[in-house]
């Protein structure tokens, strides 16, 4: 035919002389093999008219060049892409995929196929953007697609790429290809209104990673986009030596920001909101952030600028119409709840419609993490959840003492699809002590009314660790209203009885996860658990640590009946050998039998029987000392904590995968073992040695050859060390604890540690009596991101006070005892306001004049436990001061649990 032309398609990636395939006609059934053929040349016959109509390249070629009079035309391009383009030209059919759309767009632009470009735009707008967070593979092709769209002048596709990257920024920021994202695309995503991240911390980290090789001005411009008020304080403190952050001149967010500041970054695509450690978050900020976010309402993307700026920051005592509307919709108490700190803005009448059609919704939000957010009040959080994110599936308010277990009663109506709820608190320390005076309770705040309780049909995992106020009647109600629970943590719920726990277990026979450490778990609970096992027991995790009410016989019955355990903790219980010998399980991966009566023979038998065992703890098991059969066991452990009998295991063992090694009393490690430790355990990350006979040279040799070591803990060595081994510490170290090890440690040596270990997060020094007040300055300047600090019997460290430590904003645990009587009486109050994340504070009355002032009802803020030790002076002929030596008398312990405050007097120094 006259209008036909033979096209010779040459693959630009093939060498000359490659194999060819001939196609006599372009029939549809021949096209699929043609696409799949990996040939260097393809000859085919096509219509000259159709090519000219649908491609400006061919139209020009057939009009103005010699090919206009030739029946043979050579076209060189990537053969697979060109075949797809010709399919679109001749058959108006395209095969578009994430991996090929960039090449297709580039080819379509070159060949002038506007229809194909339009189809690419449609596919990107519909298929690619619709898969947003579901198709992770698409992300790796976005940078090239953006580059091609920018170079070929297709701004709609370039903007679509920026939007897609913004929506999936969380996945891109954690991927390996972050550095391959073009800077302009990265900037466009960061500035996009639909930027979706779970935490500002993740955005900050991604910017720091991406801008390592960019100019300073560029990095600062991007860092300015981070909403620093929602970056956890401890993370910001860790970045204090970052020159970029210092140049940005940002103050640490210790208090809630002004309401006019930028709110939380929310979008309609937000699935996870992680505010853990952002103690400055309040319930008002949660509401305000939703109102000011670009969220889809009634089919349109709008920025909620309907807020009345003139009345937005009104000091009126009455709540705005929006709040009144919410309270009228969801009354939580008989009297309507009002915000006390700040008032929400007034909003337009459209938002206040009874049908709530104008209220922004976070329909995609599934996980809400509010750990350590002690300023968020339960009543207002309930309103926020019910109004904006009723599809929530996971809620974490751990380390938030203001939340009690009965917040669950409101969650049932606020988010009926909740699956995981975490209300964990710190475990009480009282179980470790002998109580001299009984607990006295005091109501801190008026709790909200419990009200009616709908059934949680989907709740499968519940964490109530540390809820000492939880009663049997309340646990029984939880059991009735949460019938689907398969995982629960009741550790530290000391107010529960054995019968109360047993009743709960009877109602949940399909538990797979049970933590009941430090409870009254006893014979009745064992019987209930075994009754459930008669059906079909799937219990995989069981923690009964410190459950002293369990008899040896009850433990034997338990272990002989349940075979599904993967993790088992029975430390400091009445476990005996029969429990391990008669155990029917063979799938244990984690076993903790510390402080029990088992012998080495039983431990050896258990190791042989459970070949998947990766974590073993048998410290303080004195019966393991004399059994040499342990030396024959082959171990594939990741974590080993041991004392008596461990010498037999470590005699000739190589543990190439061991990451954690804790050796205590009875371990009897030798100098040879310590020197060979790096070759035996090359992956070691955590090393703890207690009550061992150590030498500086041996420690120095071992530490220097452990490149992955992050934790070093030395306690009560049999002879004092000079501290020479400290020269081998590296920048990888995160935790350093020297307790009664280096009495001669000086400020100069501490400064040397500060130089080599800049990333410390935990520091504990005990009996370092040569330190003075200069040590506090070294600590505060060297490690601003410390989360745990303990100084006990450290010379005169606090003789001049401890005000210099008040810049350690990330502290969560602080112990200062017998370091010099320079602490002011109001130190506890100062600490509660200066350390926004502080949970545990331990002091000694010897370090102040008189007694410490304790917080009033409303001043506890984030603190959950205060321990104040008291001493008495015993006359001594060797003491020249006349007062005698100090001897511990008792410890006053104040624990905040929910809305109550408990006070104990115990014998031990806790």
Task: Enumerate the language-model features and the residues they cover.
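N-terminal BTB/POZ boundary and linker segment
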Residues: 1-48, 87-99, 151
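Beta-strand elements of modular eukaryotic interaction domains
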Residues: 10, 32-41, 62-64, 73, ...
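Alpha-helical scaffold in the C-terminal half of BTB/POZ domains
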Residues: 44, 82-83, 90, 96-366, ...
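Short active-site loop/helix that positions an aromatic residue
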Residues: 50-62
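Interdomain boundary/hinge elements
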Residues: 64-76, 133-138
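Eukaryotic helix-linker segments that join adjacent hydrophobic helices
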Residues: 76-85
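C-terminal capping region of solenoid repeat domains
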Residues: 268-270, 275-276, 283-284, 290-365, ...
């Amino acid at each position: 035919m006259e209008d036909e032309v033979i096209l010779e398609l040459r693959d630009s990636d093939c060498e000359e002389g490659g194999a060819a395939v001939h196609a006599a006609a372009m029939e549809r059934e021949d096209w699929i093999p043609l696409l799949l053929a990996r040939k260097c040349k393809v000859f085919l016959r096509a219509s000259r008219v159709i090519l000219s109509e649908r491609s400006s390249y061919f139209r020009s070629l057939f009009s103005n060049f010699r090919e206009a009079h030739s029946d043979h035309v050579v076209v060189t391009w990537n053969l697979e892409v060109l075949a797809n383009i010709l399919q679109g030209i001749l058959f108006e059919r395209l095969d578009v995929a994430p991996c090929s759309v960039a090449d297709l767009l580039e080819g379509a632009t070159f060949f002038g196929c506007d229809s194909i470009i339009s189809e690419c735009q449609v596919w990107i707008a519909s298929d690619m953007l619709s898969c947003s967070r579901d198709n992770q593979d698409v992300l790796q092709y976005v940078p090239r697609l953006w580059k091609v769209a920018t170079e070929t002048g297709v701004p709609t596709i370039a903007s679509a790429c920026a939007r897609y990257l913004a929506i999936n920024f969380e996945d891109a920021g954690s991927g390996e290809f972050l550095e391959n994202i073009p800077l302009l695309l990265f900037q466009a995503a960061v500035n996009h209104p639909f930027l979706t991240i779970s935490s500002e911390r993740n955005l900050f980290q991604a910017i720091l990673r991406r801008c390592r090789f960019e100019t300073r001005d560029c990095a600062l411009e991007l860092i300015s986009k981070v909403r620093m008020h929602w970056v956890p304080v401890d993370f910001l403190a860790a970045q204090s030596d970052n020159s970029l952050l210092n140049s940005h001149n940002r103050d640490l967010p210790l208090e809630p920001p002004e309401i006019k500041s930028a709110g939380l970054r929310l979008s309609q695509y937000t699935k996870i909101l992680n505010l853990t450690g952002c103690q400055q978050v309040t319930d008002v900020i949660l509401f305000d952030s939703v109102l000011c976010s670009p969220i889809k309402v009634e089919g349109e993307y709008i920025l909620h600028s309907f807020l009345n700026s003139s009345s937005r920051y009104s000091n009126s005592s009455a709540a705005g119409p929006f709040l009144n509307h919410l309270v009228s919709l969801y009354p939580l108490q008989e009297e309507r709840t009002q915000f006390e700190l700040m008032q929400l803005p007034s909003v337009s009448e459209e938002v206040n419609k009874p049908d709530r059609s104008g209220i922004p919704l976070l329909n995609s939000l599934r996980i809400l993490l509010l750990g350590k957010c002690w300023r968020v009040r339960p009543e207002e959080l309930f309103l926020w959840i019910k109004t904006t994110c009723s599809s929530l599936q996971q809620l974490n308010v751990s380390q938030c003492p203001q939340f009690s277990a009965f917040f669950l009663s409101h969650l049932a109506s606020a988010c009926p699809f909740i699956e995981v709820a975490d209300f964990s608190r710190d475990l009480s320390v009282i179980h470790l002590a002998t109580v001299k005076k009984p607990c006295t309770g005091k109501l801190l705040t008026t709790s909200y009314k419990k009200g009616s309780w709908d059934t949680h049909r989907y709740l499968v995992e519940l964490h109530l660790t540390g809820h000492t106020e939880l009663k049997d009647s309340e646990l029984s109600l939880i059991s009735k209203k949460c019938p689907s629970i398969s995982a629960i943590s009741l550790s530290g719920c000391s107010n529960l009885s054995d019968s109360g726990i047993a009743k709960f277990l009877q109602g949940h026979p399909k538990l797979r996860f049970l933590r009941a450490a430090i409870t009254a778990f006893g014979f009745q609970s064992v019987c209930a658990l075994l009754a459930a096992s008669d059906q079909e027991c799937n219990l995989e995790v069981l923690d009964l640590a410190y459950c002293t009410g369990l008899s040896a016989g009850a433990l034997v019955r338990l272990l002989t009946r349940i075979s599904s355990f993967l993790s088992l903790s029975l430390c400091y219980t009445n476990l005996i050998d029969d429990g391990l010998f008669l155990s029917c399980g063979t799938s244990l991966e984690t076993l903790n039998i510390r402080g029990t009566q088992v012998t080495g023979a039983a431990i050896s038998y258990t190791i042989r029987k459970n070949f998947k065992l990766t974590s073993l703890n048998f410290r303080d098991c004195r019966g393991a000392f004399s059994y040499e059969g342990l030396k024959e066991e082959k171990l594939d452990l990741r974590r080993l904590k041991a004392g008596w009998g461990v010498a037999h295991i470590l005699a000739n063992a190589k543990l190439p995968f061991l990451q954690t090694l804790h050796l205590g009393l009875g371990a009897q490690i030798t100098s040879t073992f310590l020197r060979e430790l790096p070759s035996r355990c090359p992956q070691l990350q955590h090393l703890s040695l207690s009550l061992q006979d150590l030498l500086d040279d041996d420690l120095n040799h071992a530490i220097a050859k452990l490149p992955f070591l992050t934790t070093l803990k030395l306690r009560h060595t049999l002879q004092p060390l000079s501290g020479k081994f400290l020269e081998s510490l590296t920048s990888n170290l995160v935790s350093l604890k020297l307790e009664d090890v280096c009495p001669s440690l000086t400020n100069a040596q501490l400064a040397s540690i500060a130089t080599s270990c800049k990333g410390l997060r935990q520091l504990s020094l005990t009996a370092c009596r040569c330190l003075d007040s200069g040590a506090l300055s070294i600590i505060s300047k060297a490690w601003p991101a410390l989360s745990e600090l303990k100084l006990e019997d450290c010379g005169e460290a606090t003789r001049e006070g401890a005000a210099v430590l008040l810049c350690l904003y990330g502290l969560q645990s602080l112990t200062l005892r017998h370091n010099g009587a320079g602490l002011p009486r109001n130190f506890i109050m100062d600490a509660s306001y200066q350390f926004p994340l502080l949970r545990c504070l331990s002091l000694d009355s010897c370090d102040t004049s008189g007694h410490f002032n304790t917080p009033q009802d409303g001043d506890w803020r984030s603190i959950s436990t205060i321990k104040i030790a008291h001493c008495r002076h015993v006359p001594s002929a060797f003491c020249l001061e006349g007062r005698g030596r100090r001897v511990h008398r008792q410890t006053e312990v104040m624990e905040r649990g929910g809305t109550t405050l408990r006070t104990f007097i115990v014998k031990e120094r806790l």
